Amino acid sequence: MLPENGRSTEDLLAELARLKEGDLPVREGRVAAYVYDPGRPHVREAGHRAYLEMLEVNGLDPTAFPSTVALEKRVVGAVAAVLGGDASTPGVFTSGGTESIMLAVKAARDTGSGREVVLPVTAHPAFRKACHYLGLTPVTVPVDPGTLRAVPSAVADAIGPGTALVVASAPSYPHGVVDPVPEIAALAARHGVPCHVDACVGGWVLPWLADAPPFDLSVPGVTSLSCDLHKYGYAPKGASVVLFATEELRRAAYYASADWPGYTVINSTVQSSKGAGPLAGAWATLNALGASGYRELAAEAMAAAARLREGVAGIPELRVLGEPDAPLVALASADPAVDVFVLADEVAKSGWFLQAQLSYAGIPPNLHLTLTGVSLAGVDALLEVLAGAVAAVGGLRPDLPGGLAGTVEGLDLEAVDDRAFVELLSAVGVTLGGPGGSPTAAVNTILDGLAPATREALLVRFLSALNSPHTD
């Protein structure tokens, strides 16, 4: 509620601190998703101070605030120089990977006649979201069941006269493997179709590795590429870049409107008004770390991933999916007695968060880990926790009320309001608004048994209920 009289800054900050008590920790590497910690206080300070310095600057009109143009040129130029481009490579600074992908899809749509986007099943849902928003149709292709990489022959079969864009991941988020970008980009070029490389998660770690597969703008046929700086760039959240091979493609990503009596609108992104804090934070972070700093952090993250894989090899009940090219690892069960959803809850008791991933297209349920610059120091402790948790959960399954899974599957969601949905969630032990890392095995088990469309409908209702006053 809005107070009648203003509150003091100290009071407000104290309340924020109380609200954050239920959050997962953002530092020290115990949360293997969502957050990226360089473990270097001076880098965080540079990013934070620059962010605050530009907090009130509005990027809506670059002619009013030319500092935003100067900063964007510097950030885009720095990213392009590392990712196969040069000082003349066009690009756009965006709020995140989804917005970068949205612009790449829009550019492809507006420069061609196709209305289909060909993508591997492992491609990020941001592409499906872009298709949904932009009136396009996603055409998914399978990945190799062993390597989990996109299969070029399947991509070739999917490309047709209606194709607007072909997508490859570098790497795919779920399993950390890089698709065969040269082969896929060549196929797209042969058909005269743009090819986008989604390097949102890997674009700022792969370039610093000596043995990274080819994936960037230097690969013939790659016409656009997205790279998040708030991931392995370690910048404050809200920082991504989309690069284009031509000025024509970047112009097609823009939006302008003069068909009204107000000010003329020209947007480089989906957003109009936008604070310049993230842009300044990204610029400062890039310069505070420099190439040598990123090289060191990438090596440490990869060393952590290698140590994790080595340690998991000594736990017979677990296995790594695929052969990751980046410091992202997915752990699946190698023993029917070990349920990965139950395992995640057990590991959480020791203060570690592993991200559950549901089964899909023949890929088993698994636990995702993103390893960062601070992960190496704690990976042995995590392996000890994993080994102990595996021993503790053998043979255990989520405690589900009888018939609940069938009830959920047959539920008419349109006939259930948020209050009733909250009551349904409480039946499986879910308390909305509870602390991060609360038990989720029961929910994940139910979702895992449902078709993707049903999962999505339930997740929408979950989000609606989470933001409902009935959950206060």
Predicted regions and their residues:
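Non-catalytic terminal extensions of PLP-dependent enzymes
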Residues: M1-P62, T68-V69, K73-G77, A332-D472
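Active-site C-terminal subdomain of aminotransferase-like
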Residues: D211, F215-P327, L331-P336
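Predominant activation on well-ordered alpha-helical scaffold segments within soluble catalytic domains
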Residues: E72-A80, M102-K106, R128, P182-A185, ...
